[in-house]
Amino acid sequence: MGAIGVIRLSGKQCFQVAERVFKGKKLHVQKSHTLHFGSILEEEGRVLDEVLAGIFKGPKSYTGEDVIEFSCHGSPYIIDRILQLLLKNGARLAKPGEFTLRAYLNGKLDLSQAEAVADLIASTSAGEHRFALHQMRGGISREISRLRQQLLDFAGLIELELDFGEEDVAFADRTALHSLVGEIRNM
């Protein structure tokens, strides 16, 4: 339990669902990546909590979809009541990892980055944290992409050698190829 709770809505209906319980500015007309103060209202119109609503319009959001994040007071009662109100108004609870899955399916993360999110959450040491964060930011993906491109370049040079086989020419540097294979093995 913390001082602040964050409740995230993502998907096509997130603005409609949120606006049924949020009193303040109309969220769907606000600019992306903005915060808006307002209240969450109980069904009878009584204020449950004062919140900040963060607006993240797709595709420029974590999931690639429209996203609203309510930052509320961290009371378990308040968080549970807000969740219940959202569920009654058309939301459903996300499955574990669903937001990251949506980000992956919408091309916001590659598989390595999506796996790194779970690693980051589960990290128990500074080293695990650093590695997972590096991977999540695309470090491993960039390295794999770089090595893949080098392999494709070598394959093209070897094809040239095969095409000009009778002329006894070497286009591909065998030492560099062995070095690249060593780099791949050490990953």
Residue ranges and their predicted role:
Residues 1-130, 134, 138:
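A glycine-rich (often HGG/GG-containing) alpha/beta subdomain
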Residues 38, 128-187:
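C-terminal-of-GTPase-core extension/linker across diverse P-loop GTPases
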